[in-house]
Protein backbone atom coordinates (compact mmCIF):
# COMPACT_ATOMS: atom_id res chain seq x y z
CA UNK A 1 0.00 0.00 0.00
CA UNK A 2 1.32 3.43 -0.94
CA UNK A 3 1.86 6.34 1.41
CA UNK A 4 -0.80 8.98 1.04
CA UNK A 5 -0.36 12.71 1.62
CA UNK A 6 -1.65 12.52 5.20
CA UNK A 7 1.17 10.13 6.16
CA UNK A 8 4.06 12.23 4.84
CA UNK A 9 4.40 14.55 7.89
CA UNK A 10 4.71 11.49 10.15
CA UNK A 11 7.43 10.03 7.93
CA UNK A 12 9.33 13.33 8.08
CA UNK A 13 8.94 13.55 11.86
CA UNK A 14 10.30 10.00 12.05
CA UNK A 15 13.47 11.38 10.43
CA UNK A 16 13.71 13.94 13.26
CA UNK A 17 12.45 16.74 11.02
CA UNK A 18 9.94 19.37 12.06
CA UNK A 19 7.83 19.73 8.91
CA UNK A 20 5.74 22.88 8.60
CA UNK A 21 2.65 22.59 6.43
CA UNK A 22 2.44 24.99 3.52
CA UNK A 23 -0.83 23.37 2.47
CA UNK A 24 -2.39 19.92 2.87
CA UNK A 25 0.07 18.37 0.38
CA UNK A 26 3.25 20.44 0.88
CA UNK A 27 5.68 20.67 3.80
CA UNK A 28 8.87 22.59 4.45
CA UNK A 29 11.71 21.78 6.83
CA UNK A 30 14.83 23.79 7.59
CA UNK A 31 17.83 21.69 8.55
CA UNK A 32 21.29 22.58 9.80
CA UNK A 33 23.95 20.58 7.93
CA UNK A 34 27.70 20.54 7.58
CA UNK A 35 27.37 23.01 4.69
CA UNK A 36 24.96 25.39 6.37
CA UNK A 37 21.19 25.69 6.40
CA UNK A 38 19.27 23.54 3.92
CA UNK A 39 15.60 24.17 3.16
CA UNK A 40 13.72 21.09 1.97
CA UNK A 41 10.25 21.20 0.44
CA UNK A 42 8.24 17.98 0.13
CA UNK A 43 5.15 17.92 -2.10
CA UNK A 44 2.75 15.01 -2.56
CA UNK A 45 1.29 15.56 -6.04
CA UNK A 46 -0.90 12.52 -6.50
CA UNK A 47 1.17 10.12 -8.58
CA UNK A 48 4.50 11.67 -7.51
CA UNK A 49 6.27 12.79 -4.35
CA UNK A 50 8.67 15.67 -5.00
CA UNK A 51 11.49 16.44 -2.56
CA UNK A 52 13.55 19.56 -3.28
CA UNK A 53 16.28 21.62 -1.69
CA UNK A 54 15.10 25.11 -2.61
CA UNK A 55 17.23 27.10 -3.09
CA UNK A 56 20.31 24.91 -3.41
CA UNK A 57 22.72 27.74 -2.61
CA UNK A 58 22.62 29.68 0.64
CA UNK A 59 20.93 33.05 0.06
CA UNK A 60 23.45 35.73 -0.83
CA UNK A 61 26.26 33.27 -1.55
CA UNK A 62 26.19 33.54 -5.34
CA UNK A 63 25.96 37.32 -5.71
CA UNK A 64 24.47 38.30 -9.07
CA UNK A 65 23.75 34.79 -10.33
CA UNK A 66 20.44 32.98 -10.23
CA UNK A 67 16.92 33.67 -11.44
CA UNK A 68 17.85 32.14 -14.79
CA UNK A 69 21.03 34.19 -15.21
CA UNK A 70 24.20 32.09 -15.24
CA UNK A 71 27.60 32.39 -16.90
CA UNK A 72 28.17 30.53 -20.14
CA UNK A 73 29.18 26.94 -19.49
CA UNK A 74 27.89 26.68 -15.93
CA UNK A 75 24.65 24.85 -16.75
CA UNK A 76 26.58 22.36 -18.88
CA UNK A 77 28.81 21.64 -15.89
CA UNK A 78 25.70 21.11 -13.76
CA UNK A 79 24.35 18.62 -16.30
CA UNK A 80 27.68 16.79 -16.23
CA UNK A 81 27.38 16.45 -12.45
CA UNK A 82 23.88 14.95 -12.90
CA UNK A 83 25.41 12.02 -14.79
CA UNK A 84 27.16 10.96 -11.58
CA UNK A 85 24.11 11.22 -9.32
CA UNK A 86 21.60 8.54 -8.40
CA UNK A 87 18.10 9.27 -7.12
CA UNK A 88 18.69 13.06 -7.06
CA UNK A 89 19.28 15.60 -9.83
CA UNK A 90 20.06 19.27 -10.19
CA UNK A 91 17.42 21.32 -11.98
CA UNK A 92 16.17 24.88 -12.35
CA UNK A 93 12.93 25.85 -10.63
CA UNK A 94 10.22 28.05 -12.15
CA UNK A 95 12.22 31.15 -11.17
CA UNK A 96 15.41 29.83 -12.78
CA UNK A 97 17.16 29.09 -9.49
CA UNK A 98 19.26 25.94 -9.00
CA UNK A 99 17.51 23.26 -6.94
CA UNK A 100 18.40 19.71 -5.99
CA UNK A 101 15.47 17.34 -6.27
CA UNK A 102 14.25 13.80 -6.05
CA UNK A 103 11.03 12.48 -7.56
CA UNK A 104 9.40 9.30 -6.31
CA UNK A 105 6.33 7.60 -7.78
CA UNK A 106 3.73 7.27 -5.02
CA UNK A 107 2.41 3.92 -6.27
CA UNK A 108 3.59 1.40 -3.64
CA UNK A 109 5.78 4.09 -2.03
CA UNK A 110 7.19 3.04 1.33
CA UNK A 111 8.51 5.21 4.17
CA UNK A 112 11.96 3.65 3.71
CA UNK A 113 12.08 4.96 0.12
CA UNK A 114 11.30 8.49 1.33
CA UNK A 115 14.03 8.14 3.97
CA UNK A 116 16.53 7.02 1.31
CA UNK A 117 15.62 9.93 -0.98
CA UNK A 118 16.03 12.36 1.92
CA UNK A 119 19.38 10.80 2.79
CA UNK A 120 20.58 11.15 -0.80
CA UNK A 121 19.41 14.78 -0.99
CA UNK A 122 21.29 15.75 2.15
CA UNK A 123 24.40 13.72 1.28
CA UNK A 124 24.52 15.28 -2.20
CA UNK A 125 24.00 18.79 -0.81
CA UNK A 126 26.88 18.29 1.60
CA UNK A 127 29.12 16.87 -1.12
CA UNK A 128 28.30 19.33 -3.91
CA UNK A 129 27.12 22.66 -2.46
CA UNK A 130 30.57 24.20 -2.19
CA UNK A 131 32.09 22.72 -5.39
CA UNK A 132 29.06 23.71 -7.50
CA UNK A 133 29.07 27.21 -5.98
CA UNK A 134 32.80 27.49 -6.70
CA UNK A 135 32.23 26.33 -10.31
CA UNK A 136 29.53 28.98 -10.72
CA UNK A 137 31.73 31.77 -9.39
CA UNK A 138 34.71 30.57 -11.45
CA UNK A 139 32.61 30.50 -14.63
CA UNK A 140 31.31 33.96 -13.74
CA UNK A 141 34.82 35.37 -13.56
CA UNK A 142 35.54 33.97 -17.01
CA UNK A 143 32.36 35.02 -18.83
CA UNK A 144 29.51 37.54 -18.73
CA UNK A 145 25.98 36.40 -17.73
CA UNK A 146 24.09 34.35 -20.33
Model-based region annotation:
Residues 57-61, 104-113:
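A generic structural motif
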Amino acid sequence: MALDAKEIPGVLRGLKWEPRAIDDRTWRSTLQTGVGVVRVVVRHAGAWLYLSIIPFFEPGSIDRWGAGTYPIGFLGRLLAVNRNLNMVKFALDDDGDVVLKSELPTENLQASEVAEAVSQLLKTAEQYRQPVRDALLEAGRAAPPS
